[in-house]
């Protein structure tokens, strides 16, 4: 039932979806009226049980899930509420999710007071979207009143299959999107991002504010033949504080330069030359510096150096051995 329902709206999930749906017997319309099923889950003390299915998963007491569906007419409605859900570095509080299908599309609404994922804190978080004809449209926003950071990111993603390998792919395009603080606003977007299980192709992802510019372009994969390029022009590091604030570090300043990484999803061969200006960490001024990195093919490791820009003297030197995940 779930597979057939999904491929109705995302047929590229299964090349045989049309054939399989055609084989389903037709039911008289009257038979679909009362063929509803209801699944309800009300969590009491389930953390020990939840950990069996997903180690480390914690659910708040009172978490509720309700799923109403009719397998004959392919109609469903889902709601979920929870005071919190936590696992590892993922945390969400006051979660409210609702989704339903109607006609030829699925609608989705999600709201949370706080979401913390991958080191990024996003309060007052919401997602609105829909799924129709292999396309997923999402509008995602958050608003951090503590530090003034906010974002509105709108995308349309098309699910498809690679014509040669048959691997499912997601082709992402951006509507006008922004990231801002109480002092300035960055426009962000890309010509296109193509993602599958083997690689990610980025076509000119940019964050721009006036003369500031950050551009990511290229291919991230496990292959040394693919390289991801980063270029920054007088780019304000304020957006980085959205990640570092929760670790107790407020970072400001500007950076310019470039970096290239081959096999970005594999061992990661990095070449970089990036200058840092007017850097402050927790309001403490730092020296203007430059970070350089190159690959030592003989030793199969990355050499890096952080040097004083004015004196051209090294502050930190070392290397990274990808095969051992070791810094020195």
Describe the function of each predicted region.
Residues 1-258, 265-328:
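Interface amphipathic segments
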């Amino acid at each position: 039932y779930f597979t057939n329902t999904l491929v109705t709206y995302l047929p590229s999930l299964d090349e045989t979806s049309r054939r399989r749906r055609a084989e389903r017997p037709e039911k008289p319309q009257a038979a679909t009226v009362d063929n509803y099923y209801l699944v309800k889950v009300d969590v009491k003390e389930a953390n020990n049980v939840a950990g069996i299915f997903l180690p480390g998963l914690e659910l708040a007491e009172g978490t509720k899930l309700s799923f109403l569906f009719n397998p004959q007419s392919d109609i469903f409605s889902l709601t979920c509420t929870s005071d919190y859900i936590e696992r590892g570095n993922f945390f969400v509080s006051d979660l409210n999710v609702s989704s339903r299908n109607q006609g030829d599309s699925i609608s989705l609404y999600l709201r949370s007071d706080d979401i913390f994922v991958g080191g990024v804190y996003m309060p007052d978080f919401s997602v609105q979207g829909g799924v129709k004809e292999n396309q997923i449209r999402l509008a995602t926003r958050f608003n951090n009143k503590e530090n003034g950071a906010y974002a509105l990111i709108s995308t349309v993603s098309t699910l498809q299959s690679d014509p040669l390998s048959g691997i499912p792919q997601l082709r992402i395009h951006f509507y006008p999107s922004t990231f801002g603080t109480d002092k300035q606003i960055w426009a962000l977007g890309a010509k296109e991002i193509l993602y599958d299980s083997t690689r990610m192709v980025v076509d000119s992802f940019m964050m721009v504010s006036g003369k500031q510019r950050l551009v990511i372009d290229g291919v991230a994969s496990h292959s040394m033949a693919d390289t991801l390029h980063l270029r920054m022009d007088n780019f304000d590091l304020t957006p980085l504080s959205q990640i570092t604030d929760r670790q107790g570090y407020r970072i400001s300043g500007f950076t310019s330069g470039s970096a290239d990484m081959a096999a970005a999803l594999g061992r990661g061969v990095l070449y970089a030359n990036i200058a840092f200006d007017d850097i402050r960490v927790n309001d403490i001024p730092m020296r203007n510096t430059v970070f350089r990195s190159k690959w030592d093919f003989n030793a199969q490791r990355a050499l890096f150096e952080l040097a004083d820009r004015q004196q051209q003297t090294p502050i930190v030197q070392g290397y990274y051995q990808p095969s051992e995940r070791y810094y020195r």
